[in-house]
């Protein structure tokens, strides 16, 4: 589908990802951002709900900002598979002509988004950290038309070492994927209702359809760092994988979870799913300990909205202190164990009383 008349494309659409009849958090976050973008464009937010027997989820989408829900419900959509889901979303785009389409940068979204963008012949910017409406080019260039009300999609590039702002001025829809935790949900409006429109273009299984023989769900006994209320995060300054034991001891006393910077993952000390930052996860815990972390902008972007930030670093000029609410300049190998012991003693005293 080549865009012939851009003016025909209206509205902000959000792919409302659901798994096992439960709306994913990223869908609610994107509805919040979609509401903001739609207000600037003076249009509506539409959630595209794809699955089987999922109509009951529409009210929740309305509570989090959807003005309208387009429901594509079919037995072929019971479990995510690339071809039927791509067919469903592409068919919606071709019929309704949205100006903007937002998809979560989840395992599903990273597969679905680019497949659909190729199918409808438009561009897609992946793993965005900022979405806003503005002019493009950002600065007027003599002799070149500056287009207004464009979706400006900002994302880290070159391994997070630079930030790129990208637009898609000549094609519609403008498509972006966004990492979970980057955008914020709106406060739910209890009892809100959305207009529901059911649409099914039909499904004809072909050689692109895979057959799912069995679904094996991973079981984890660890807390997702995006859900943790207290994070004890370590950086290169921790020194080694073994030395993370002192951070784990502190986290245990606090009832928190250990996380880390990209340098730690690059060194093989901790797995990728514990990484905080632009190329990791965006977190907003109640308390964030930044231990042995210098405070590179890429890391700060992933944790600066924490309620309380405590930084421990031997370098008093480390940028992390610029965003910290409390800072301790000192050797983490001495400071952290001492802090852990003090907290243990305080807990024991409280328990005794």
Predicted feature locations:
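N-terminal glycine-rich FAD/FM-binding segment characteristic of electron-transfer flavoproteins
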Residues: 1-353
